Amino acid sequence: MALNLSPEQGVKLTKKDRVHVAKKIKQGWKATCLIPDYGFDENGDIQVMSDRNRRTVKIVKIKDDGIYIEKALKSKNLRILWGKISLVSPTKEIKDGLKIDMYDGKYVVFSIYNSYKIQQITQYIFNYINDKRTNNEAMYS
């Protein structure tokens, strides 16, 4: 599956860039996120408070078991397991953003803070997430 974000002509990620991006994927990136408006009810259970997603700036990490958005729920991390992701696609909600659709109908959008080769890095992250998701589906099917 290919994604064309129409990157600048002739600008490519070098081997050094790819190594740096791979390292940053694990460490985490500061990103503008649109996440479901989760909150806690009186019993302490997680509930969706409204249908609209809220915009926030968080650290996004992509680990072996899923995507983590740090402190998305007060002090708790939001973890999106590979098995819960139904589709990854580019979006116009946030400039150079990626939309992660889940099987339960919710979605998360994020765009990393980086002005240097942003479209190529977003393309790399898109491919990385898709590979992880597909490998996870193949492993459990």
Task: Identify the residue ranges that each predicted region occupies.
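Anionic N-terminal interaction surfaces
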Residues: M1-V60
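A structural detector for beta-sheet-dominated domains
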Residues: K26, L34-P36, M49, V60-K63, ...
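Short acidic, gly/pro-rich beta-turn/loop elements at beta-sheet edges
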Residues: C33, D41-N43, E70, F110, ...
